[in-house]
Regions:
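Acidic, metal-coordinating catalytic segment for phosphate/diphosphate chemistry
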Residues: 1-19
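Class I (Rossmann-like) S-adenosyl-L-methionine-dependent methyltransferase catalytic domain
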Residues: 4-10, 77-89, 138-141, 145
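Short connector loops at helix/strand junctions that flank enzyme active sites
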Residues: 15-17, 23, 34-36, 41, ...
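Active-site beta-strand termini and strand-to-loop segments that position acidic
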Residues: 22-25, 97-99
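Conserved Nudix-box catalytic region and its N-terminal flanking loop in Nudix hydrolases
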Residues: 23-62
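Unchanged
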Residues: 46-70, 77-131
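…; additionally, a secondary subgroup of soluble metalloenzymes is captured
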Residues: 125-145
């Protein structure tokens, strides 16, 4: 069973991922990977020596084409799941982004972005990302607006 937990902070060296809950003009922004039939929030792995904020900026640009945006850290999250990193707890930083402008073309493994009024039914990570959004809503007070 997958376990997701939330923290106010964690040792920077433990942060391996950045996930960005992304909105534009009051709508949700999700990514569709070219090899999947599901949607996901933008995010990805931290590169060696990379600041976690830079990870979030890089992933947001690579996966959505966002070129004008505000970006704020929300909280630390962790995931523990059998078969995922040998069942070890892994940590990431959850961010909130408001995108004002996108590039016209994507330059990554992402086939397209979807700008939606509602949350997806088919998630790439159904045991994780809906919980991240719920925590984002709780901590930011933004809800589905």
């Amino acid at each position: 069973m997958t376990k997701v937990q939330f923290y106010d902070r964690a040792d920077d060296g433990k942060l391996r991922f950045a996930v960005i809950i992304t909105r534009t003009e009051g709508h949700w922004v999700f990514c569709k990977h070219r090899d999947r039939d599901t949607l996901e929030a933008p995010g990805g792995h931290r590169e060696p020596g990379e600041d976690i904020l830079d990870t979030a900026k890089r992933e947001l640009y690579e996966e959505t084409g966002a070129i004008d945006f505000s970006l704020e850290p929300v909280c630390v999250y962790s995931v523990t799941a059998p078969g995922n990193f040998d069942g070890q707890e892994t940590f990431g930083m959850l961010f909130s982004a408001d995108v004002r402008k996108f590039e016209k073309e994507l330059h990554s493994e992402i086939e397209r972005i979807e700008i939606r009024d509602d949350l997806p039914e088919a998630w790439t990570y159904p045991e994780i990302q809906p919980l991240l959004i719920r925590e984002w809503e709780r901590r930011t007070g933004k809800g589905g607006q």
